[in-house]
UniProtKB/Swiss-Prot annotation:
HAMAP family: Ribosomal_uL3_B. Methylated by PrmB. This is Large ribosomal subunit protein uL3. The lineage of its organism: Bacteria, Pseudomonadati, Pseudomonadota, Gammaproteobacteria, Enterobacterales. Keywords: Methylation, Ribonucleoprotein, Ribosomal protein, RNA-binding, rRNA-binding. The keyword rRNA-binding applies. It comes from the Bacteria.
Length: 209
């Protein structure tokens, strides 16, 4: 089953009939418009390309304008691709709404996490800080040793050190679908999802459901 592209609106909470508070993320899923259908004969795999939202006319490049015009759809804010399963069929220009998730219990949500800039090991990797006193005057938040000796004489790949934190593609799996509001194009999922308010999200049925 394909997924949909939405926009993170923010977090709130809803209450069950028993008065239990559920933290939810609100995702606005406007109609996803099919801009291209890829098939085995021409592309070697089956997939659809979709767009959503709108883009100012002066921000649409000529290649983009031609691509959207050929599909007969309004220029969107980006292009995304979803692989098709056997038996799934879509046509160029078709609109896919949030009702796609009407019978889905759990979803995987992919987004770009908030960028935190250059961060030390305590913030980035949850390293313990060293002693505040007892003779320690300069090394409270330093990572400590990063290697051994002349053998192996190098720092191993993957060593946890200071560096860029966040601003990377992150997927949160198996979030419960709390509500599908087709009238307002909203999808409510339990818990937090990656990214800042207003950022694009890819929502797919959970692979581990």
């Amino acid at each position: 089953m394909i997924g949909l592209v939405g926009k993170k609106v923010g977090m709130t909470r809803i209450f069950t009939e028993d008065g239990v508070s559920i933290p939810v993320t609100v995702i606005e899923v406007e109609a996803n418009r099919v801009t291209q259908v890829k098939d085995l004969a021409n592309d070697g795999y089956r997939a659809i390309q979709v767009t959503t939202g709108a883009k100012k006319a002066n921000r649409v490049t000529k290649p983009e304008a031609g691509h959207f015009a050929k599909a007969g759809v309004e220029a969107g804010r980006g292009l995304w691709e979803f692989r098709l399963a056997d038996g799934e069929e879509f046509t160029v220009g078709q609109n896919i709404s949030v009702e796609l998730f009407a019978d889905v219990k759990k979803v995987d949500v992919t987004g770009t996490s908030k960028g935190k800039g250059f961060a030390g090991t305590v913030k980035r990797w949850n390293f313990r800080t060293q002693d505040a006193t007892h003779g320690n005057s300069l090394s409270h938040r330093v990572p400590g040793s990063i290697g051994q000796n002349q053998t192996p004489g190098k720092v191993f790949k993957g060593k946890k050190m200071a560096g860029q934190l966040g601003n990377e593609r992150v997927t949160v799996q198996s979030l419960d679908v709390v509500r599908v509001d087709a009238e307002r194009n909203l999808l409510l999922v339990k818990g937090a999802v990656p990214g800042a308010t207003g950022s694009d999200l890819i929502v797919k049925p959970a692979v581990k459901a």
